[in-house]
Amino acid sequence: GKSTLPGHLLDFSIGQYDTYTPIQISQYINTIANGGSRLQPYLLKEVYESSKENKEGFGTKIYEASSKELGKVDVEEKYLNRVKEGFKAVVSYGLGTQYMGSYQSIGAGKTGTSQSFIDTNKDGVVDTETITTSFVGYAPYDDPKMSIVVISPDVADASAETTSGIDKRLSSEIVNKYFEIYK
């Protein structure tokens, strides 16, 4: 924003009024996990032909996505490592425990909560305050193999049990399943 009012400056300093897509949030966490290298995201990793001999298996690989570096964050490694240590602390013994499922000890991440407002009866008037909760993380901490972004928009029940419970259940099940498949 362009406002210089003291209250607005405080809001801006913590990211209030900023909006990001899940892909942008994913790039953010992956840039940190990758030591400051910002990589181009892709949604499809590999494509295989069907196997004629084995109905359960894969045939020949016909496509594999390649990594492309889009840029490098200009920051000293010690500062980037400090952020990573903070992310590790969040899931190890902070408010982010249980978000990494059975892999809490090897993960890193960040929780988030923001105010949101909606028009509940579609009359053009924003009439209800809600919150949007989020969790973003990666694992393993020392050699990242996966990352996750969970965003729960417009949660009406602002109790801590409800808000964090949604993201915890989703992220922990996804992380557990990932490591079950890719041991």
Regions found by a protein language model. Name each.
Residues K2-E69, K78, K84-K183:
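Active-site beta-strand/loop architecture of penicillin-binding DD-peptidases
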Residues K72-V73:
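HHCC-type zinc-binding knuckle of retroelement integrases
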